[in-house]
Regions:
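Mg2+-dependent prenyl diphosphate-binding active-site environment of isoprenoid biosynthetic enzymes
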Residues: 37-299
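N-terminal amphipathic/basic leader segments beginning at the initiator methionine
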Residues: 1-32
């Protein structure tokens, strides 16, 4: 049973995260203006990035940076977080396209290509990626070296060692029989790499030690796997904001091993993630408490 002190601490973390979430959404609103009523690409960019979402990656970037003792100006750090969310939004727009996952619903709304057409959706995704890198390159309060390193981390997460590779593997192998290891590798590219970039960007700005950066890398790898396993477990549930049963006929760990075994694996990944996170952030625990509370709430809904 949670003590009064612990409950108050968790409530504070939730309140803090809500405040950061508001900051992220306000800044995204500023960074993604629509020039005119005819600016369909701009409107699609805004809808893709500002549709109601979890904002887990930018929240973790901000929380981890603070736990690491980051002294960068709030504006510069916030811009890095928003850039991560733009990359994530761009990847979702592309994932949902008819030639890929052919999804009709995302974040409780019609997908971008359903609203604006495929041509606008593709252009909006490319423009979001371009905007994200520009925002990082111009982030206030960071040294030129820090900005360049942050751009490199984000670039790595997008390309053939990240989101692009993950989506290609999912499209080319997802409907074929696969081993658990092959599925985990796809999950790594699809999900873990952007978490890794988020944590490494926080580390860069906070000037964290090499050991802390390595621990955060390991945290991100495990967190990404846990996140993807949770996504697989909730496929078919009505309140995810996405098309139900998207994984039918796909070789996921849930289909291979069953929900109970996957939940056990998920909790193992969370435990490992927690150990690495606490090793990296020894003077701040906001990130740890946020991750634990978020997953426990989600797991309670599927148990």
């Amino acid at each position: 049973m949670m003590t009064v002190c612990a409950e108050q601490h968790v409530n504070f973390i939730h309140s803090d995260a809500a405040s950061l979430l508001n900051d992220i959404e306000q800044r995204l609103d500023q960074l993604l203006p629509v020039e005119s009523e005819r600016d369909l690409v701009g409107a699609a960019m805004r809808d893709g990035a500002l549709a109601p979402g979890k904002r887990i990656r930018p929240l973790l970037l901000l929380l981890a940076a603070r736990d690491l003792g980051c002294n960068a100006t709030p504006a510069g750090l916030l811009d890095l977080a928003c850039a991560v969310e733009m990359v994530h939004a761009a990847s979702l727009i592309l994932d949902d396209m008819p030639c890929m996952d052919d999804a009709q619903l995302r974040r409780g709304r019609p997908t971008i290509h359903c609203q604006y057409g495929e041509h606008v959706a593709i252009l909006a995704a490319v423009a979001l990626l371009s905007k994200a890198f520009g925002v990082v390159a111009a982030a206030e309060g960071l040294t030129a070296t820090a900005r360049a390193d942050a751009v490199a981390e984000l670039s790595h997460a997008v390309g053939m060692q990240g989101l692009v590779q993950g989506q290609f593997k999912d499209l080319s192998e997802g409907d074929k029989p696969r081993s658990a290891d092959a599925i985990l590798m796809t999950n790594h590219y699809k999900t873990s790499t952007l978490f890794c970039a988020s944590m490494q960007m926080a580390s860069i700005v906070a000037e964290a030690s090499g050991e802390a950066r390595e621990q955060l890398h390991r945290f991100s790898l495990n967190l990404g796997q846990a996140f993807q396993l949770l996504d697989d477990l909730t496929d078919g549930m009505a309140d995810t904001g996405k098309d139900a049963h998207q994984d039918e006929g796909k070789s996921t760990l849930v289909n291979l091993l069953g929900p109970q075994a996957v939940e056990t694996r998920l909790r193992d990944h969370l435990r490992c993630a927690s150990e690495h996170l606490l090793s990296a952030c020894q003077d701040g625990y906001a990130t740890h408490h946020f991750v634990q509370a978020w997953f426990e709430k989600k797991l309670a809904a599927v148990s």
